[in-house]
């Protein structure tokens, strides 16, 4: 066979013409040291704060420290295989997470990756995790109620859409229960809920998800979980991931609720990262910017102006106290950032007062303007009456003979405490709360309280049976309150007549 030189050269030319190798250019550095998920990297001179890096095995990292000759980065994933001298690449990207309706009903990790075994999210939109909170001009004052379904909160420390209300208390006082009841109560209210679990046991998160599924609340809820076994960077980032997902609904003119359970553990994770990055420690060994850690997160909850779509994002951060100490560093920080706090007390919890809300310390700085008129009408004096009762009860234990007026006040106070008791996973619509509080605070034609003759231990049963009776015989009363959101003379007349009728039916046991 004859080899022709011109044919060979033509084939070579054709092959060269079609050959196109893309050269990947990336700034690469090497790891100087790696300990507990924090790496120091040499050679990434162009890296920016908050930029994502790529470690061996496809693990991502986040730049936190920029120093003269190295950068400090938090590794967001398993780091046991990463060694000194390993190469690290810049990605040029800032951390972003999937957002949108596709996330409803899903459980994701601190970076928005699905962990519920139901396949990919297929989200159409992504957003950067760290963005600035809306300015003053874009906001509107809080004026719409965000009902929790709990009488003690909706009557005494009301929450409005766009508010930030702190829930704090010792461990095992029912903080998560208050948050979960709020989610359950808003079924059918077009409120999209986000539950961020930080540093919790995976079994606890699974139990919360099961509860939400059982009551049909997972349809409008997303769970973001950075569990106790996840690296500290994931626990630090999870709240920002959650708020970014919730902001999507706020910015599209809808209403969202986010629960951070709990921010004490996020602060501990951030302290761990900061100490490993050798940042100077401050009070309780927290870094100097731990206030900014929480303020920039909670400022993203807002009620937007009509021009911006009138959407809202309500935040319920949870803080765990140690032995009821609200004057510790993190609790005081978050109290000063939020618009009020609900303080849960272990003593009340053990006495059977649940939810165990200390009405004296709990406040809502802006929620009053969001409370419906009907609730203001019936619960106006409730807080004062309870405060007087607590004061008298403290003195009464020292004295044996009390005058009749004091005995009356104590008896009434005991019934009011019973009136505000409520079981878990049993939130009440606001119109039914108004009816129960009306029965507990208003007087009948004889000038006596409606529940004056009911023994204290039977008040809870009285309230339950009263609602059952009204639902069966007089359903129009609750409907009228729900529509008018106020108690006019007609509703009062109907309610008094129904209460008189119920008084003849209710049987006192024992």
Swiss-Prot record:
Site (Required for activity): 362
Gene Ontology molecular function: ADP binding; ATP binding; proton-transporting ATP synthase activity, rotational mechanism
Positions annotated to bind ATP: 169-176
Chief subcellular location: membrane
EC number: 7.1.2.2
Catalytic activity from the UniProt record: ATP + H2O + 4 H(+)(in) = ADP + phosphate + 5 H(+)(out)
Keywords: ATP synthesis, ATP-binding, Cell inner membrane, Cell membrane, CF(1), Hydrogen ion transport, Ion transport, Membrane, Nucleotide-binding, Translocase, Transport
Topological type in the membrane: Peripheral membrane protein
Signal peptide: none
Annotated NCBIfam families: atpA (TIGR00962), PRK13343.1 (NF009884)
Role played: Produces ATP from ADP in the presence of a proton gradient across the membrane. The alpha chain is a regulatory subunit.
Family the entry assigns: Belongs to the ATPase alpha/beta chains family.
Protein's UniProt name: ATP synthase subunit alpha
Lineage, top ranks: Bacteria, Pseudomonadati, Myxococcota, Myxococcia, Myxococcales
Gene: atpA
């Amino acid at each position: 066979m004859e080899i022709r030189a011109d044919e060979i050269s033509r084939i070579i030319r054709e092959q060269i013409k079609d050959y196109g190798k893309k050269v990947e250019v990336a700034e690469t550095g090497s790891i100087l040291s790696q300990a507990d998920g924090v790496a120091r990297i040499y050679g990434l001179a162009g890296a920016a704060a908050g930029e994502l890096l790529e470690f061996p095995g496809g693990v991502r990292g986040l730049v936190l420290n920029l120093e003269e000759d190295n950068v400090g980065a938090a590794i967001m994933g398993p780091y046991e295989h990463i060694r000194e001298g390993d190469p690290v690449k810049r990605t040029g990207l800032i951390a972003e997470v999937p957002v949108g309706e596709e996330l409803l009903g899903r459980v994701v990790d601190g970076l928005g990756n699905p962990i519920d075994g139901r396949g990919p999210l297929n989200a159409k939109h992504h957003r950067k995790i760290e963005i600035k909170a809306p300015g003053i001009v874009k906001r509107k004052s809080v004026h719409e109620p965000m009902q929790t379904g709990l009488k003690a909160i909706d009557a005494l420390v009301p929450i409005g859409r766009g508010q930030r209300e702190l829930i704090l208390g010792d461990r095992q006082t029912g903080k998560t229960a208050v948050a979960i009841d709020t989610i359950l109560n808003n079924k059918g209210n077009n409120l999209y809920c986000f539950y961020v679990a930080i540093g919790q046991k995976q079994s606890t998160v699974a139990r919360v998800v099961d509860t939400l599924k059982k009551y049909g609340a997972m349809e409008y809820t997303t769970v973001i979980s950075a569990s106790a076994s996840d690296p500290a960077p994931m626990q630090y980032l999870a709240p920002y991931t959650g708020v970014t997902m919730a902001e999507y609904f706020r910015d599209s003119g809808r209403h969202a609720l986010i629960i951070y359970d709990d921010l004490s553990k996020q602060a501990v994770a951030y302290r761990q990262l900061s100490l490993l990055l050798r940042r100077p420690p401050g009070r309780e060994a927290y870094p100097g910017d731990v206030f900014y850690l929480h303020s920039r997160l909670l400022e993203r909850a807002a009620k937007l102006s009509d021009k911006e779509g009138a959407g809202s994002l309500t935040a319920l951060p949870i803080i765990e106290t140690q032995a009821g100490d609200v004057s510790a560093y993190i609790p005081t920080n978050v109290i000063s950032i939020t618009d009020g706090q609900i303080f849960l007390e272990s003593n009340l919890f053990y006495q059977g007062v649940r939810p165990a809300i200390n009405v004296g310390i709990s406040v809502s700085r802006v929620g009053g303007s969001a409370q419906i008129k009907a609730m203001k009408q019936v619960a106006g004096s409730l807080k004062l009456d309870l405060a007087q009762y607590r004061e008298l009860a403290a003195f009464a234990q020292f004295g044996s003979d009390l005058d009749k007026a004091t005995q009356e006040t104590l008896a009434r106070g005991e019934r009011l405490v019973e009136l505000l008791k409520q079981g878990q996973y049993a939130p009440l619509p606001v119109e039914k709360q108004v009816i129960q509080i009306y029965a507990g605070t208003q007087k009948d034609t004889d000038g006596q309280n409606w529940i004056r003759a009911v023994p204290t231990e039977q008040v809870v049963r009285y309230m339950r049976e009263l609602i059952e009776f009204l639902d069966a015989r007089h359903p129009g009363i609750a409907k009228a309150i729900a529509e008018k959101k106020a108690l006019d003379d007609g509703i009062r007349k109907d309610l008094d007549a129904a209460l008189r009728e119920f008084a003849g039916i209710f049987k006192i046991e024992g």
